[in-house]
Amino acid sequence: MNVRFAEHDDLTAIEEVTRWACSEAIGEMVPEDVVESEVHRRFRRSVLSEHLLSRRLLVGVSANNDIELVVLVDDRTDHIELVTSVVPTRPSRAADGVSLVDSLRFMGWLGPISSSVPLGDTVHEHFYELAGFAPGEVTVERVEGHDVFRREWWLDPVLSAAG
């Protein structure tokens, strides 16, 4: 998987990927209108465009040029937070979290990284686990009157060889 900055021409495909991935991630826990609300809140066109213009919207693209990963990068006080959508796995392959981490580090994001994943979203959990993230605290978020439980995943900062 090749990770790159998203382009304007990617936006329609990004919206399709995020809708599909969110439905797979929380669709069995909450009604479909809650899924749509979650997609709108996290991935509406204005949010995507804002991240695109500030070069904080990344996509992971397969060898066939299909978008398999959508990443919004947000600065926090002491780390960056990722909002991700991972295409549900195919039997033969899954999106590669290691490529994402390598790309983020290459782009200069060297500090700690976190991401919040719905509990039970095994595609996302596996993605972060293989990339070296450690599971953290569980939180509950109220979305349209429904509880959505999430786990924070954390990746330590890059340590300097100079000490």
Show where each model-derived region lies.
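Conserved N-terminal entry element of GNAT/NAT acetyltransferase domains
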Residues: M1-T12, W153-G163
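Short alpha-helical
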Residues: D9, A13, I67, T122-V123
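Hydrophobic pocket/interface hotspot
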Residues: I14, T18
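Terminal substrate-recognition subdomain of acyl/acetyltransferases
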Residues: L130, V140-G163
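Conserved beta-strand-loop-alpha-helix junction that forms the acyl-donor binding cleft
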Residues: S114-H126, R142-G145
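Conserved acetyl-CoA-binding loop of GNAT-fold acetyltransferases
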Residues: R105, Y128-T139
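Acetyl-CoA-dependent GNAT
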Residues: F5-H8, R19-S92, V98-M107, E141, ...
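Short acidic/polar active-site loop segments enriched in Thr and Asp
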Residues: D78, L110-I113, A134
